Amino acid sequence: MPQKEYYNRATWESGVASMMQNSHSGVNQLGGVFVNGRPLPDSTRQKIVELAHSGARPCDISRILQVSNGCVSKILGRYYETGSIRPRAIGGSKPRVATPEVVGKIAQYKRECPSIFAWEIRDRLLSEGVCTNDNIPSVSSINRVLRNLASEKQQMGADGMYEKLRMLNGQTGTWGTRPGWYPGTSVPGQPNQDGCQQSDGGGENTNSISSNGEDSDETQMRLQLKRKLQRNRTSFTQEQIEALEKEFERTHYPDVFARERLAAKIDLPEARIQVWFSNRRAKWRREEKLRNQRRQASNSSSHIPISSSFSTSVYQPIPQPTTPVSFTSGSMLGRSDTALTNTYSALPPMPSFTMANNLPMQPSQTSSYSCMLPTSPSVNGRSYDTYTPPHMQAHMNSQSMAASGTTSTGLISPGVSVPVQVPGSEPDMSQYWPRLQ
């Protein structure tokens, strides 16, 4: 199998190489060959126009002829505008189509009907014989001329206000002493030298075609095709919208059978239904993004603040001593090192925790404080019962240790216990601490 695939790939590459040698320089994504920098042949252009006349969409024409969609759209757009399928000249400058005469007619049409569209002006230029299919300006060129007219009127200032009123009243005359928009611009109010009569209907005479033989018939057919292919926005009824929304709730990506069934049900073309679902999915993605943003904002605002204090319900409360205990670690350890002399005053009560699982904490035991001894190979951290100095015994509670001295067990580590003798009246700890050290 790998050898067969390699053979097929080698055959395809050799075929492409042979095509490139025969004046072809590339293969597009659809599998069609083209010559880079050169226009399509006239036969392919004629097929594109014929398929468009038969009702095929540009995307279908692109797949049928294996020509890129942009190329098909560009050729059809130029054909609708000029009626020509010939490519434009390669290199050089284009001839100027916005001549002073054409600019004057455009200004005249704009004065007669301020709401006229650029494509209507273009049709009037063709119908009145001002331009031909070869030198007719495009819609973008007409819009550019209209923008220049508007900017020129804004720059007139106070002196131009009177001229604007004259234009609105339809009075003939010049545009004041200012020069035209282009050098040598003809006066808009003067009649055309070609003898073309001015139409009084404004934009209503856009479909009137001058009878010039075969060119007139061809132009009329082309304009009708252009009006047919340039559709308006589809208006959906409430029943159609409900059916589409119901299908969208079922699935966001209906197959061709579902679209055809829905098209027969609500009397809409399948292509319109496909476009509606594409737009509806885009709208749903925008709404979903907003919902996620709101959900994140609500979650961040409803977070519970973290408390730095421990819950008191976990540990058993320990009774606090009535008198603050004050002692020095140096006196307890029997050492005179100044670095270890730290005064503890008013220490909070801390429970004594053990690692023994079977030894519960007795509530009657007194609180203990954890003292960290110096690091040694055998001693790490130990917990001792509360040491009460002799001068503090009178202020202790009756539940504290008796003065005669009681024996308790101080747990050092898991499984190890050391008996601790708490002296009652002797301040000397020499008999006690050496045992631990």
UniProtKB/Swiss-Prot annotation:
GO terms for cellular component: nucleus. PROSITE patterns: HOMEOBOX_1, HOMEOBOX_2, PAIRED_1, PAIRED_2. Residues 23-149, 229-288 bind DNA. The keyword DNA-binding applies. SUPFAM superfamilies: Homeodomain-like (SSF46689). Spatially restricted regions of the neural tube. Residues 187-213 have a biased composition (Polar residues). Residues 174-222, 286-317 are annotated as: Disordered. Residues 26-82 are annotated as: PAI subdomain. The keyword Magnesium does not apply. GO terms for molecular function: DNA-binding transcription factor activity, RNA polymerase II-specific; RNA polymerase II cis-regulatory region sequence-specific DNA binding; sequence-specific DNA binding. Residues 101-149 are annotated as: RED subdomain. Pfam families: Homeodomain, PAX. Its main location: nucleus. It is found in: Nucleus. Transcription factor expressed in spatially restricted regions of the neural tube during embryonic development. Belongs to the paired homeobox family. This is Paired box protein Pax-6.
